[in-house]
A protein has these predicted regions:
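Bacterial N-terminal signal peptides that target proteins for export
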Residues: 1-8
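Short coil/turn linking the two alpha-helices of tandem helical-hairpin repeats
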Residues: 155-156, 162, 201, 223-230
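Short coil/linker segments at helix-helix boundaries
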Residues: 159-180, 229-234
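Conserved, well-structured interaction surfaces
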Residues: 46-60, 84-158, 173-184, 190-205
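Short linear capping/connector segments at secondary-structure termini
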Residues: 31-34, 97-100, 165-172
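Hydrophobic core
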Residues: 13-16
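C-terminal motif of bacterial Sec signal peptides marking the signal peptidase cleavage site
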Residues: 18-20
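An aromatic- and glycine-enriched ligand-binding surface/loop that stacks and positions planar moieties
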Residues: 22-87, 191-192, 207-293
Length: 296
């Protein structure tokens, strides 16, 4: 009897100690916020959304903004670049330098993909919050706009790409998704942006507006691969007519004014990245350090 009592007491003591240790090991961190805690407060989500602009802007710094256009009829390198940079030359000439080891190709992906993931987290968080519905609505529009932009550019290069949706992680995983799925997300992101974004901001010209969202939605309808069944020029036309009818935008009288570093955010601009002409806070264009706006 005593032996069994001793065994029972020992087992009970072990169970209590194990439970106590378990409780101790599961103490919430006090020096940092968990993602769940971040998602609870809209004040914690807004910096994540605003950081998306910085991430997207980083994709365009220096020569980065030119790389996706090399090999098209929009840009062409000079002989110096062709001689001095094999990786860069391959982007323009489609020669042996355009291969899986190209740092230029990998940088196009690596500069954008982390921001896609961050945007997906912000979208998930804003879908959960019940605080300040109007503010959350605008931030949702901004996060969707940036994710749509990034996925648009990545799919133009790689076609089938992964889709990050925090509500469908088990279903979608991390692998490439069919083109139709990819472009449904791109188009739906821009539709959300058109429904949620304001026409302007008081003193923050770098933020996405409803005009920019309509422009990108129109571009997405035109650019969607035919096999997706989503290409629709009639819908694109309606998007662009909506912009015209807003009465906020018009063409400049002098085309050259678009490229003046001291003339940012003109009445022709729908969405601009705020660069200046001083290295390293600049964007290269034809080997000049000038202000480049990237109107959609």
């Amino acid at each position: 009897i005593y032996r069994y009592s001793a065994i029972y007491a020992l087992a009970l003591s072990f169970a209590l100690n194990t439970s106590s240790c378990s409780d101790f090991l599961q103490v919430e961190p006090t020096g940092s916020l968990t993602e769940e805690q971040v998602f609870e407060k809209i004040d914690n989500v807004e910096p994540l959304v605003l950081g998306l602009y910085k991430s997207y802007r980083g994709c365009k710094e220096g020569r980065n903004g030119l790389m996706p256009y090399l090999g098209t009829d929009e840009t062409q390198q000079g002989n110096y670049q062709l001689i001095s940079s094999g990786d860069q030359a391959g982007m323009d000439k489609y020669n042996g330098q355009l291969n899986p080891t190209s740092t230029q190709v990998s940088s196009i992906w690596n500069n954008r993909w982390p921001a896609v993931v961050s945007a997906a987290k912000a979208i998930y968080a804003l879908g959960m919050t019940t605080e300040e519905p109007e503010r959350a609505k605008q931030l949702m529009g901004e996060a969707c706009f940036i994710r749509g932009l990034l996925m648009f550019e990545l799919s133009m290069y790689w076609g089938e790409i992964p889709v990050i949706d925090m509500n469908r992680t088990d279903e979608l995983g991390l692998g490439r998704q069919p083109l139709k799925t990819v472009w449904e997300y791109i188009i739906n992101d821009f539709i959300t942006a058109t429904n949620n974004l304001p026409e302007s901001y008081n003193s923050e010209p770098q933020r996405a507006t409803v005009g920019a969202a309509w422009a990108m939605l129109g571009k997405a309808y035109m650019a969607a691969p035919e096999e997706t069944g989503l290409r629709d020029f009639a819908k694109a036309d309606e998007c662009f007519k909506t912009i015209i009818n807003m009465g906020r935008y018009e063409l400049l009288n002098d085309y050259a004014d678009l490229y003046r570093y001291d003339n940012p955010n003109t009445k022709e601009s729908l969405f601009e990245l705020q660069f200046n002409n001083v290295y390293p806070d600049c964007n290269y264009w034809e080997l000049s350090l000038i202000h480049i706006s990237e109107p959609t």
